[in-house]
């Protein structure tokens, strides 16, 4: 399984994409009502940010106000899964993601942990348009329900660490190994193309 995370400024569009993409399934809405529109989801997140505006970012709106997470187990790892299995993976990922302490690396107390569990977020299951492989999209509020900012420093590294912890627990392939395999596949493909070009260019 691999995972990647970033903070984004286009939160409304991201949530709309997660929810409205063709054949998308809503896995979970955390601290949000069921059956509301993507616009309403984003609106409720912004209400929380406005409520605590004086306590966060010196009263200024957050430029990157949504955390975007993509979680992609391999086809073999998720074969035969039900929606409950996907919900379980999203819950486990959030727990592990929140628990990782990066304060020593960032030299910031705010990096000790995040609180996505106590934040509004939506989880959607997507199917890759080419391969059909299933993966999760999570869009979370940068501000939790108590008015604290979910720290974004080294957030991509936090996601990779969370994925690797879960891979270890479940006996799955580590993300670094997946990267090596992908690089080898690309290298092999390039070599095949190179050899075919040599063959074509040879005089008959």
Predicted regions and their residues:
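N-terminal nicking endonuclease/strand-transfer module with a His-rich metal-binding environment
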Residues: 1-197, 201
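Ser/Thr-centric signal marking residues that sit
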Residues: 204
